[in-house]
Amino acid sequence: AKELGCTNTHFANPHGLQDENHYTTAHDMALIAQAAYQNETFRIIIGTKMYTIPPTNKHAEETVLRNHHDMLCTYHNANRKYLYPYCVGGKTGYTATANSTLVTYAEKDGMTLICVVMNTQSPNQFIDTVNLFDYAFDNFQVLNVAENDTDYRAETTVDNGNLNNIAPFVELDKEAVIVLPKTAEFSDTSSSVEYNDSDPEIAGSITYTYAGRNVGKADIKTTGVVVEGYAFDNESTEEEEQEAVSTVQVKPKRKW
């Protein structure tokens, strides 16, 4: 949890039952949920509505497991009142001290959101989550960085005095996105570049902010293109002799 950036979380047990040394916050739980969602098996499990375990040597009959998340299925929601069409999974929780808690994932228009609701009375955890999701989907948008950022130009320059060859040596991550209010444009963001010398496949990264808040990041990836320079003059003076030099340049047009 600490590696994910959690600052107010301490686990005293693996099951979540009440313990005075077992605590977290909505923000920390969202960070944990975000990391967990990167695991494909986890995504399958939380989105499964029902699963049947076949008979085993310990249990002669089938065991049917049902998801209790009312925004995803109808096990405790026969009238379908809380079903949410964009819900893709989540986890319910309850103790007498913590009351009802809920972590939910929803996807719409290319945007995946996580909502964490704590310390509420059922069924308010579902009502509040639906309202929060609706507000976010109605008011925010996902923008692809590579398709929208024209302020950075990545190129290689090979210069030996006779040849200036420009080729695509690095490029912005084509999958990187940022999240902005629908009233804002990509050009409204500010950005900063951090260079990387520890990963041969990542030249650096660009962090985007809007209204002082971090709204996303895009890696600057190497493409694997190799550019070689050749000197055309067999005889040259000492001042003219230059080795072919390859450089990676990320040229921002914007001012930070």
Language-model segment annotations:
Residues 14-20:
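Conserved short loop/turn motifs at secondary-structure junctions
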Residues 1-10:
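Short, charged, amphipathic alpha-helices and their helix-cap/turn boundaries
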Residues 6-7, 21-23, 27-28, 33-256:
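Domain-terminus/edge residues, biased toward the C-terminal soluble/receptor-binding domains
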